[in-house]
Amino acid sequence: MPSHLRTYVSRFRRDRRGNVAIIFAITAIPLISAIGCAVDYSSATRMKAKLQTAADAAGIAALSQKSPGFLAASLMTGNGTVTAGVTDANNVFDGNMSGITGYQNLVRSSTVTKTGIKLAATVTYTADVPVTFLKVIGVQKLTVTGASSSAASLPPYLDFYLTLDVSGSMGLASTAAEQTRLSQINPDNYRQYPTGCTFACHFAPQNSACTNTGTQGYPTNNYCLGYKISRVSQSGYTNLLMTNNSYPKKQELPTGIVSGLPNSLYAPKNPGPKSGLTGGGLTAVPNCKVAGTDDCIQLRLDAVGYAVTELFKTANESKKVPDQFRIGLYPFIRYLYAYFPLTKNINGLPTTPGTINYAAANLATLLDTNVNTDLGSGGTHISAALTSVNGLISGGSGAVGDGSTPTTPQPYVFLVTDGAQNNQVKGVPNGSWSGSNHATTIDNQNNLATVPSCETLKGRGVKVSVLYIPYQKIDPVNTSFAGNEGTYANENIQYIPASLRKCASSLDFFRTANTPQEIQDALDAMFKHALQTAHITH
């Protein structure tokens, strides 16, 4: 190497000037590329967040109550794709992305499916985000992808078979105060129970259960008046009574009214002294929804009927889709009677005849009268009623619906009773008595490990919910009356709760209620429990 060249090389090696510029020049390209990558990736991340928000909103909207997809799925009779939900999800996604720029080649896809009462929605997307700085290293775009999944439950379709005890014991006045009011004015069975009868004795035929000299506290034309009295103004009826110490109750009705009983109670009052009255001028009410009013005396069946009308309100407020619930009223004495069969029309008024609401409000009119051949008379045939209810559900055999579609409703039986089974029978009308009047229970006072009529229902998948309205102790007991049935009835009370618990689907399907408000609250709780358990089960 020539000497002058070696000199230049040596100088270059020893010279430290300009090193920063040279190093910067060497590192500039990768540094700028890194900064550019961060900017481009940040832009892509922001775009992905917008796309994800749109996907989340689309999935949720597709399954929201009252959305096209939700309503369409609720009407499907099987499982599969919910087309209306897919369309709705896509529309919501597109709407949320409308007006947003900064992406290309967007592809989105939605699926909405129904399986039983479960709904599932999935929204996926992919899009290209243009880049600026990354082009330096040959990258022309960033692709972002994502997915959103949502789930919901359809409201279950439920059928409610309200199996309602309307036997004589349900004619007990609804509260202690109402029982006192009735006992003070009721002439029925006064000779047997001089402290006063708290039941609205209800047998309608003359000489059927009440006679002037055999049972009554004063002459009643051989008719039972307890139920009639419970339906009229208490002050109005009291004002018809006159003092007469020759009768056990020390009272009497005007002779002209007695001879025309019971219709004379409602005939117009004629002018003149009370002793000459031939009409009472009273107006009967079909139901008594409030205790303590002068218009009537509330019976347990009135309280149950009012509670059922309130149940309809709860059902109407709770339904999420049209026709979600059907309810039927099935009272029983000896036979089960389809008083108002299953109906989806439960939003009527208690004052509108022809509606299930009106039928429920007037449930007390079905109290055992010994004239209704549909219900029969005498005793309380709970097991027979449950067997009959089973026959009404899906033909009486086989598995029942799971509530996932309108054509496969889940059936619930609501048994409302005081639980005292009595197998005696009285011919209709005004027939003779047959069978034992000794009270028992549906498990024969704990002699049966299970209750066959209840097990049949539960074995098919029917849910059985029980409302026990405690049978009231008879006090004092007249041991000479009706073969000492009062003693047997009292001794039976201890076995009732356990027997009804056996009937219920589980312990949380059993409730006890005594007062009118408790009865209303219990029925409301039973309905809400049915909704809750239907969701959990499915």
What are the functions of these language-model segments?
Residues 6-26:
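Glycine-centered recognition micro-motifs in short, flexible terminal segments and loops
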Residues 14, 32, 415:
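Short glycine- and Lys/Arg-enriched binding-loop motifs that mark or flank ligand-binding interfaces
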Residues 19-22, 28, 56, 308:
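Alpha-helical structural signal
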Residues 25-39:
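Alpha-helical hydrophobic helix detector
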